[in-house]
Amino acid sequence: MSNFIDKTFTVIADILLKVLPASKQEKQAFSYYRAGMSAQSEGKYAEALENYYEALQLEEDPYDRSYTLYNIGLIYGNNGNYSQALEYYHQALELNSNLPQALNNIAVIYHSQGLNALQMQNQDKNLEIRNDEYLELAKEFFDKAAEYWRQALKLAPDNYPGAQNWLKVTGRQISEEYF
């Protein structure tokens, strides 16, 4: 099914490139973006990154750049490079603050880091860092996750039910406005 969707997207994109008025540079940027999306959907992350970086060199529209930056963040996040992923998600949000999916992904990374800190507390009894320091570190990560999930839910109140539940269960929800 995803192959059908990818082919359909390619056909529609080709038609749009021919029909819509756009400069040669804009069309070329979109072609690189589309090639990046195709490679990413096939799991060819290095190829996808090359295409996205080419698209960034050509793309001038901040809104379109934000989605390219977001997709780069996705690739880094999927490959476990969370600091790079965070960097690209934040760059995307600077250009387009209406990206709840980027806010959600940032929250997921911070939540994961909080869980890792708790796991370190349980596993590494011999390290110099004290248990309460692990707990404080975990709390900081969880608070950051809550901050970004609240922002995502303000933009997309019907999305992220797991985040909504986590905010309620942990007492980190601020208001009922998005529930």
Swiss-Prot record:
Belongs to the Ycf3 family. The lineage of its organism: Eukaryota, Sar, Stramenopiles, Ochrophyta, Bacillariophyta. It is a peripheral membrane protein. This is Photosystem I assembly protein Ycf3. It comes from the Eukaryota. TPR repeats lie at residues 29-62, 66-99, 126-159. It is found in: Plastid, Chloroplast thylakoid membrane. Essential for the assembly of the photosystem I (PSI) complex. May act as a chaperone-like factor to guide the assembly of the PSI subunits. GO terms for biological process: photosynthesis. Disulfide bonds: none annotated. SUPFAM superfamilies: TPR-like (SSF48452). One of its GO terms (cellular component) is chloroplast thylakoid membrane.
